């Protein structure tokens, strides 16, 4: 089989001669088109790799007016959730022949706006955005520029923009129902306000489970704390704030905690282990994301599992539809969740 010399570029015509297929079939196979049988695609792609074929992205872009590149603007990368989402988005994009440009806003509106401008300057076809509470201005800017985009993991309202999220209300309901099933009836919801919409959806699920179990309002507690992942957040103040709140809840007889996400639940478990007055507290903990189900995580958490791969597939497909002219009203895709039980929530002693 003829190899690429490093001087003479391998063309689709070369691959067609080598495989016996038409240039059109080779073209479709190399672009992973579904109209070509999988076995044929795989054979052509294997031959192309062996011959050293490299597609001409610039020429393709000039012909189509598109770059087949998407920008992904992530939040704060200290949270392992974003690494998992980045992996699954990469897989979904590759299956649809898109390249990705990853950026990080650190959950800051000013950086988010800078990232959007940088993505637009690089002529991306569309943007997957993990928004902040202040993203409405970014959304207005994207709409004004005519750049297709989808909000990932977080919504800002049902009619604001396309979004793909997990079922946050149902997830919170499952989490709190599990606490109640284990005999815990004095319950607390510990959250941040990174996204008000997410906080409120999970609060709805928290209250639905409590209502069904007949738990009175005086036995339901909520606390919104500092965000420890923000660069401008005073870590010591956050630690002290959480410690004081947990000490207070113990005095009030709280025996079950629903925590907004795994990252925060791990911080809570650290406080419980490091604070002598809290070390023997019989409190169940359930959180959200199930990071432990995907990668190593330093906590044995009972957690609501999001279908990361399905969220990524839905987001890429929705964005692709918009790129190709889909003009439907904003679509809000909600992916199912399930509860994964571990040692952080056991029957009450």
Map each language-model feature to its residues.
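Flexible loop/turn connectors
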Residues: 239, 243-349
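An alpha-beta-alpha
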Residues: 175-215, 331-346
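Alpha-helical recognition/docking segments in bacterial nutrient-uptake
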Residues: 1-11, 65-177, 181, 195, ...
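Short, solvent-exposed amphipathic alpha-helices that sit
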Residues: 43, 80-95, 171-174, 197-220, ...
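Short beta-strand elements in bilobed, periplasmic/extracellular small-molecule ligand-binding domains
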Residues: 93-105, 207-238
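Hydrophobic alpha-helical segments within soluble ligand-binding/sensing domains
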Residues: 164-189, 201-208, 235-247, 265, ...
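Short beta-strand segments enriched in small/hydrophobic residues
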Residues: 18, 23-28, 62-78, 178, ...
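N-terminal helix-turn-helix DNA-binding module of bacterial transcription factors
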Residues: 1-66, 346-349
């Amino acid at each position: 089989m003829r190899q690429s010399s490093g001087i003479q570029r391998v063309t689709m015509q070369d691959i067609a001669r080598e495989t016996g297929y038409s240039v059109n079939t080779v073209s479709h196979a190399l672009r992973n088109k579904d109209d070509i049988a999988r076995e044929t695609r795989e054979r052509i792609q294997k031959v192309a790799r062996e011959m050293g074929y490299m597609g001409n992205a610039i020429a393709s872009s000039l012909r189509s007016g598109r770059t087949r590149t998407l920008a992904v603007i992530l939040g704060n990368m200290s949270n392992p959730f974003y690494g998992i989402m980045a992996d699954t988005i990469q897989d979904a994009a590759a299956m649809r022949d898109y390249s990705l440009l990853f950026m990080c806003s650190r959950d800051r509106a000013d950086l988010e706006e800078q990232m959007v401008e940088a993505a637009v300057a690089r002529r991306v076809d569309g943007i997957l955005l993990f928004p902040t509470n202040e993203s409405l201005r970014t959304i207005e800017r994207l709409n004004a520029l005519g750049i297709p985009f989808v909000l990932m993991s977080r919504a800002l309202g049902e009619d604001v923009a396309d979004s793909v999220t997990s079922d946050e209300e149902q997830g919170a309901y499952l989490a709190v129902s599990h606490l109640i099933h284990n005999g815990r009836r004095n319950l607390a919801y510990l959250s941040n306000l990174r996204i008000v919409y997410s906080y409120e959806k999970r609060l709805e699920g928290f209250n639905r489970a409590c209502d069904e179990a007949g738990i009175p309002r005086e036995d339901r507690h909520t606390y919104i704390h500092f965000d420890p992942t923000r660069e401008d957040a005073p870590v010591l103040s956050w630690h002290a704030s959480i410690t004081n709140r947990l000490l207070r809840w113990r005095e009030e007889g709280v025996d079950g905690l629903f925590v907004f996400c795994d990252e925060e639940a791990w911080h809570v478990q650290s406080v419980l282990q490091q604070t002598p007055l809290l070390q023997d507290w019989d409190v169940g903990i359930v959180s959200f994301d199930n990071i432990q189900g995907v990668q190593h995580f330093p906590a044995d958490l009972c957690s609501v599992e999001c279908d990361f791969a399905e969220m990524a597939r839905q987001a890429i497909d929705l964005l692709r539809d918009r790129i190709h002219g889909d003009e439907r009203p904003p679509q809000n895709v909600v992916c199912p969740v399930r509860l994964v039980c571990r040692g952080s929530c056991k029957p009450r002693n």
